């Protein structure tokens, strides 16, 4: 099993999808806690998509700037409404990097809003 950690950005093959689900191979943020990440193959991720002005206006979409730490190559959006479980043993393509603590805190806040925890 891979050593995966909360806040890592990994490339994931999200196909097949249905309806309006986010698809393709794309970066995703691991949001499950590290106990689950170490013990089970199914983890929860937030897909990352290309930035655009319309998506940036949605309160549960988090703006991410590229950095050497996170491994992103362009300005992006963490689409917290599209949070989903994946089996990383089947869908993981590669590890890109790690979110900063500040960006992970913003993602946490958006997830709380999506699930009604705030």
Where are these regions (language model features)?
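Conserved functional hotspots at enzyme active or ligand-binding sites that engage polyanionic ligands
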Residues: 1-118
């Amino acid at each position: 099993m891979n050593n995966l950690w909360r806040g890592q950005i990994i490339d994931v093959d999200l196909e097949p999808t249905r309806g309006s689900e986010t698809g393709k191979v794309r970066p995703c943020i691991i949001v499950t806690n590290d106990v689950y990440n170490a013990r089970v193959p199914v983890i929860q991720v937030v897909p990352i998509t290309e930035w655009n002005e319309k998506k940036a206006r949605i309160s549960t979409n988090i703006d991410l700037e590229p950095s050497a730490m996170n491994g992103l190559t362009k300005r992006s959006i963490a689409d917290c409404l599209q949070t989903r479980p994946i089996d990383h043993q089947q869908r993981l393509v590669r590890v890109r990097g790690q979110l900063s603590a500040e960006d992970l805190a913003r993602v946490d806040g958006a997830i709380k809003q999506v699930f009604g925890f705030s």
